[in-house]
Amino acid sequence: MTELVTGKAFPYVVVTGIAMTTALATDAETTWKLLLDRQSGIRTLDDPFVEEFDLPVRIGGHLLEEFDHQLTRIELRRMGYLQRMSTVLSRRLWENAGSPEVDTNRLMVSIGTGLGSAEELVFSYDDMRARGMKAVSPLTVQKYMPNGAAAAVGLERHAKAGVMTPVSACASGAEAIARAWQQIVLGEADAAICGGVETRIEAVPIAGFAQMRIVMSTNNDDPAGACRPFDRDRDGFVFGEGGALLLIETEEHAKARGANILARIMGASITSDGFHMVAPDPNGERAGHAITRAIQLAGLAPGDIDHVNAHATGTQVGDLAEGRAINNALGGNRPAVYAPKSALGHSVGAVGAVESILTVLALRDQVIPPTLNLVNLDPEIDLDVVAGEPRPGNYRYAINNSFGFGGHNVAIAFGRY
């Protein structure tokens, strides 16, 4: 068996820019402040399709912005929704990172998505049935192809070290960051724009998940209290729109340009359950191994981890499996655990990137927001979940977990800078 590689072999990689839009705010800093203030972005949905199809789920978290007014007419004509989101976020990211001068031959892009623009194809079929082939634009393919969001950013930034689009359900955003880190430490790039974007809340995804009966909360009378990760009485997740991008680069590259360094990204691991299409391995074996490998690749030990940003969607099986995965990997260590989907909802392909930024901010500010709606911790979940009030502390190293349908597991190790 090949000897396992540890972080001692890798160049240091750091986070130097962040951009995010969520159901709470249109930027990362405001989202962060509102999470610390125990605010929720989950509201009653007022979309016409809720009544039209009599959907059993009537709650969710829409973004607080549209992107159209931030783009030119030509851009609007050529871009689908995900490309508009990624383009706007990438421009904010570049500004946040100090508008750096970079060698484009050493710049890569890695942006994941889960559902992508699949619903746009459905809408195009409706137009085609009504008006025939002339209703289909010659720009249709480029507007709705899954890699469009990453490609649009890569073209604007003239990135030539690779453009990637991980599609791994709810782990897509985290996998995009993990793949970017891997390319940098392998020497294939000096810097990467990475993260995840996801489409709007729509009728068909709600109906599809709702028909599974075990994964979505129908607590429509209490939107803000509906998602209850790790609680004994949890009954499923809630959709919450989002998108997030990070700029990561070698520490040497960042220092050379005088960048504002927010945190270290120290290790990342990707595993798979090989168990079931939509259910996690209840023992959390391979999810736990992803955490273990991220720690090893970072050159750390399980006892070094002070904080875990949990995937924790609020489903019965998922939260229990993640609790076991964390315990499998960390043994007797009990880091402070946070479950942000209780406040922001689940943005599918974007959520791993959203929560990576939250992990970075927790390390930067040395405080963890409270998990909302945790009243009675499930007795089968042996975790130290932060609830009630924000918890200041001495947080040196953290893990961000992301898991997805299909058995996808991603764990990323971050460090305080």
UniProtKB/Swiss-Prot annotation:
Cellular component terms per the entry's GO annotation: cytosol; peptidoglycan-based cell wall; plasma membrane
Complex formation: Homodimer.
Keyword Oxidoreductase: no
Active site residues of this protein: 170 (for beta-ketoacyl synthase activity), 311 (for beta-ketoacyl synthase activity), 346 (for beta-ketoacyl synthase activity)
Taxonomy of the source species: Bacteria, Bacillati, Actinomycetota, Actinomycetes, Mycobacteriales
GO biological process: fatty acid biosynthetic process; fatty acid elongation; mycolic acid biosynthetic process; response to hypoxia
SMART domains, per the entry: PKS_KS (SM00825)
Function in brief: Part of the mycobacterial fatty acid elongation system FAS-II, which is involved in mycolic acid biosynthesis. Catalyzes the elongation of long chain acyl-ACP substrates by the addition of two carbons from malonyl-ACP to an acyl acceptor. Involved in extension of the mycolate chains to full lengths and produces longer chain multiunsaturated hydrocarbons averaging 54 carbons in length. Essential for resistance to macrophage antimicrobial activity.
Top-level enzyme category: transferase
Encoding gene per record: kasB
Domain of life of the source: Bacteria
Additional record remark: Identified as a drug target. Inhibited by isoniazid (INH), thiolactomycin (TLM) and related analogs.
Reaction catalysis annotation: an ultra-long-chain di-unsaturated fatty acyl-[ACP] + malonyl-[ACP] + H(+) = a 3-oxo-ultra-long-chain di-unsaturated fatty acyl-[ACP] + holo-[ACP] + CO2; hexadecanoyl-[ACP] + malonyl-[ACP] + H(+) = 3-oxooctadecanoyl-[ACP] + holo-[ACP] + CO2
Disruption phenotype: Deletion of the gene results in loss of acid-fast staining, which is a simple and rapid diagnostic test for detecting M.tuberculosis. The region between the inner and outer membranes of the mutant, which is composed mainly of cell wall anchored mycolic acids, shows a significant decrease in electron density as compared to the wild type.
One GO MF term: 3-oxoacyl-[acyl-carrier-protein] synthase activity
Domain Ketosynthase family 3 (KS3): start-end pairs: 10-416
Protein name: 3-oxoacyl-[acyl-carrier-protein] synthase 2
SUPFAM superfamilies: Thiolase-like
